[in-house]
């Protein structure tokens, strides 16, 4: 399937003119930029031949530095040296302070509760810091390619929510970049490996970077990359390995827990150096703050084993979501510098029953995949037959009568996607409808997550069920959700784009999925009860209107029978007996059959009054 290339006005390229595109891996610890030259994707190095750019920015009154220069200042000016800013993206200040209580920065809250970092250059938000990193990467690409970039593909963790994805887009725009697409990091890795090997089947992408962990189960078939399931933890990565080892070194060296920032940075640097060395050596000598000691790989493995186990539990959940067994996975792709840790490779190999793939540099594989995709999207490969299908992590739907959730787009549906369902009014003369957008796997509103609310007004005043409202859910390639409600006869509509100020955590996603399984039987019963109660309310509402209009058609005895049946239905509808409510509804229907027939006859007579048979 070829991707259709559509050029914007004024941007149409000559038949043989290549556009300049780049793939950017905006990482927590390090970032990279890559491009396709002479048909090969490659990462771009700086003047000293270094491909990685530390995701660190040092701010001063007169300017700022990014990367290695910034990192060298970290120990001397910790408060003005911002690192791992990706972890702060799209989060509220309260969330950040709860998750990361030991950050060496001073924060202030903006009016909407988002974080502002105090620096020598003034108050800066995470979007601005990310933009400065992107500018440095773009400058490297512009110099290497001898021209301005026509577009970029930027990778994000699969578990990034709407706010985090939107923040990444905002940072790119602030950096002056045209974003062709945001691409999930595991999907980018699949592109890098899938195109090279031409392999078909199920592949697991294990991505353990500096600050995030993602596991994706993908199916590769005839050039189609389909994500069957995703999982992970946006607050777990190699940085956590570093901090555990730094704390261990601090304890061994007898350094106070609340020492100054310079010593803390020195401890962290020593831990990082030791971690890297232990990937090749059985032990390493550490010198820090006047203390010298030996640390073995065995000690390091003992420290990080619980974190590695957490990643494997996420792998197990993702496999279950995908409906595949570990032995069905053909290959395991390792992504992220932290996958160089021997214990990680060993445990992942044991879990999947095969040695993981590491033939492409795990630091570079995501950027390479992004560059390949950017080259296609910018129009340099119009005959490409690659199609990307990402998925949404949790079902999306609407609240309906009775506090029920009607799922419109199920979990793990490939995106981009658009789905629509028709709804109707519940009461006579209803002229407005409240649209409550929900996220989650449970059957009741109280057990799902509220995403947004908006109202559709201007609905024609018709009998209950007379107006028809089409609600459309659209999730774009970046995972952003738009919901539109339109009344069919008038065309009146209202819409909303879901951009929460802060997002859903990975543990909450895992918990919601787990709860949906644990309470499945209970939820089905609760839904059946709620549906019967809604039907009872509808029947009573309709009957009340009919009696108010045409009670004269009934004898006293008939009216009493109907009133008794209605009273009984009203009573049992307050309880929890589904069968009793259903039987009471049937009884009301039975008692009102003759009444309904008389009302129909009366309506026909009124319609024919004054007309001859010939006219009919």
Curated annotation (Swiss-Prot):
Database matches in Gene3D superfamilies: 1.20.1270.10, 3.30.420.40, Actin, Chain A, domain 4 (3.90.640.10), Substrate Binding Domain Of DNAk, Chain A, domain 1 (2.60.34.10)
CDD domains: ASKHA_NBD_HSP70_HscA
SUPFAM superfamilies referenced in this protein's UniProt entry, alphabetically: Actin-like ATPase domain, Heat shock protein 70kD (HSP70), C-terminal subdomain, Heat shock protein 70kD (HSP70), peptide-binding domain
Gene Ontology terms for molecular function: ATP binding; ATP hydrolysis activity; ATP-dependent protein folding chaperone; unfolded protein binding
Assigned keywords, A-Z: ATP-binding, Chaperone, Nucleotide-binding
Coiled-coil region: none
Nucleus found in the keyword field: no
Origin superkingdom: Bacteria
One Pfam family hit: HSP70
GO BP terms: iron-sulfur cluster assembly
Function: Chaperone involved in the maturation of iron-sulfur cluster-containing proteins. Has a low intrinsic ATPase activity which is markedly stimulated by HscB. Involved in the maturation of IscU.
HAMAP family: HscA
Recorded family membership: Belongs to the heat shock protein 70 family.
Name by which UniProt lists this protein: Chaperone protein HscA
Protein species of origin: Escherichia coli (strain SMS-3-5 / SECEC)
């Amino acid at each position: 399937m070829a991707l259709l290339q559509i050029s914007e006005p004024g941007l149409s390229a000559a038949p043989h003119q290549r556009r300049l595109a780049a793939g950017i891996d905006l990482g927590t610890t390090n970032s990279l930029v890559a491009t396709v030259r002479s048909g090969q994707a490659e990462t771009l190095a700086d003047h000293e031949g270094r491909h990685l750019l530390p995701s660190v920015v040092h701010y001063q009154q007169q300017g700022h530095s990014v990367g290695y220069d910034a990192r060298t200042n970290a120990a001397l000016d910790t408060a003005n040296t911002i690192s791992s800013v990706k972890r702060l993206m799209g989060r509220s200040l309260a969330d950040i302070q709860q998750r990361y209580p030991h950050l060496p920065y001073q924060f202030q809250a903006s009016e909407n509760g988002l974080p502002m970092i105090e620096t020598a250059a003034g108050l800066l938000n995470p979007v601005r810091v990310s933009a400065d990193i992107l500018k440095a990467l773009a400058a490297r690409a512009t110099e290497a390619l001898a021209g301005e970039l026509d577009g970029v593909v930027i990778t994000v963790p699969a578990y990034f929510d709407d706010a985090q994805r939107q923040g990444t887009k905002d940072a790119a725009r602030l950096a002056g970049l045209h974003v062709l697409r945001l691409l999930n990091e595991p999907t980018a890795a699949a592109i890098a490996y899938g195109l090279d090997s031409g392999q078909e089947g199920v592949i697991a992408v294990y991505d353990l970077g500096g600050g995030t962990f993602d596991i994706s189960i993908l199916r590769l078939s005839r050039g189609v990359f389909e994500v069957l399931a995703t999982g992970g933890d946006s607050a777990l990565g190699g940085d956590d390995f570093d901090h555990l080892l730094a704390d261990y070194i601090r304890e061994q060296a007898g350094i106070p827990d609340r020492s100054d920032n310079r010593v803390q940075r020195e401890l962290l640097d020593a831990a990082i150096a030791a971690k890297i060395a232990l990937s090749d050596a059985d032990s390493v000598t550490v010198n820090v703050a006047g203390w010298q000691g030996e640390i073995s790989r065995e000690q390091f493995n003992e420290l990080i084993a619980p974190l590695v186990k957490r990643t494997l539990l996420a792998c197990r959940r993702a496999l279950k979501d995908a409906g595949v067994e570990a032995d069905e996975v053909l290959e395991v792709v390792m992504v992220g510098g932290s996958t160089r840790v021997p214990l990680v490779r060993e445990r992942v190999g044991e879990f999947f029953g095969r040695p993981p793939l590491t033939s492409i540099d795990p630091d570079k594989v995501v950027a390479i995949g992004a560059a390949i995709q950017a080259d296609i999207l910018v129009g340099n490969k119009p005959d490409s037959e690659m199609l990307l299908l990402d998925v949404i992590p949790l079902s999306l739907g609407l609240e309906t009568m009775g506090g029920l959730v009607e799922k419109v787009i199920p979990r793990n549906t490939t995106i981009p996607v658009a789905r629509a369902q028709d709804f109707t009014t519940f009461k006579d003369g209803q002229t407005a409808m409240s649209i409550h957008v929900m996220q989650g796997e449970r059957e009741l509103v109280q057990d799902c997550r509220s995403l947004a609310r908006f109202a559709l007004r201007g609905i024609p005043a018709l009998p209950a069920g007379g107006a028809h409202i089409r609600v459309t859910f659209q999730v774009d390639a970046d995972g952003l959700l738009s919901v539109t409600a339109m009344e069919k006869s008038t065309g009146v509509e209202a819409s909303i784009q879901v951009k929460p100020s802060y997002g859903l955590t990975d543990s909450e996603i895992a918990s919601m999925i787990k709860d949906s399984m644990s309470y499945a039987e209970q939820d089905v019963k609760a839904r059946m009860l709620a549906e019967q109660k809604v039907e009872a309310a509808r029947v009573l509402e309709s009957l009340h209107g009919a009696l108010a209009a045409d009670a004269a058609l009934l004898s006293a005895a008939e009216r009493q029978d109907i009133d008794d049946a209605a009273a009984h239905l009203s009573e049992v509808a307050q309880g929890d007996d589904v069968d009793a409510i259903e039987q009471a509804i049937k009884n009301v229907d039975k008692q009102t059959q003759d009444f309904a027939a008389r009302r129909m006859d009366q309506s026909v007579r009124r319609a024919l009054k004054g007309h001859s048979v010939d006219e009919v």
